[in-house]
C-alpha cells in the first residue's frame, strides 16, 4: 500500500497517471479520492438471473441495451432507489505501470448500504459518457 506522498511521487515520475484528478484528492494518508461522473445507467431488471448473464451481455454487444436506462445526475443530486443496480464511471482515468490499484467505497457509503464494485476497466463503446 502506498502513502499519499508516495502516490504523488509516482504520479510526478509518470509511473501512475490520473487524468482529471481533483486538487485535494490526496488529502488522506494512503489513498486518492475519486469522483463519480454525472451520467449513470440504471439496470432495470427486477430480478437478475445469474444463469442468464450471457444473454444480458449479448444484448449489450448487439446494441439492444433495453434493460439499461441512462440518467444524467442533476446539479442538485439524485436520490437512489433501493434494490436497483447503478452503473457509472469515475471522472478520473487511472492508469499505472507496475502497480495494481485497489478501489473501495468510503465508510460513509457502506453505512448507507451502498457498495462499490470494481470491474476490469476495459473501455466499451456503449458507455462513452
Go through each PLM region and give its residues.
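DUTPase catalytic domain/fold
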Residues: 1-129
Amino acid at each position: 500500500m502506498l502513502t499519499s506522498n508516495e502516490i504523488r511521487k509516482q504520479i510526478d515520475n509518470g509511473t501512475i497517471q490520473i487524468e482529471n484528478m481533483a486538487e485535494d484528492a490526496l488529502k488522506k494518508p494512503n489513498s486518492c479520492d475519486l469522483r463519480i461522473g454525472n451520467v449513470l445507467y440504471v439496470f432495470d431488471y427486477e430480478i437478475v438471473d445469474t444463469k442468464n448473464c450471457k444473454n444480458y451481455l449479448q444484448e449489450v454487444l448487439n446494441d439492444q441495451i433495453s434493460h439499461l436506462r441512462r440518467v444524467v445526475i442533476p446539479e442538485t443530486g439524485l436520490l437512489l432507489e433501493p434494490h436497483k443496480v447503478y452503473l457509472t464511471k469515475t471522472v478520473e482515468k487511472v492508469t499505472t505501470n507496475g502497480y495494481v490499484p485497489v478501489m473501495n467505497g468510503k465508510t460513509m457509503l457502506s453505512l448507507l448500504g451502498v457498495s462499490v464494485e470494481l470491474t476490469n476497466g476495459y473501455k466499451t463503446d456503449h458507455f462513452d459518457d
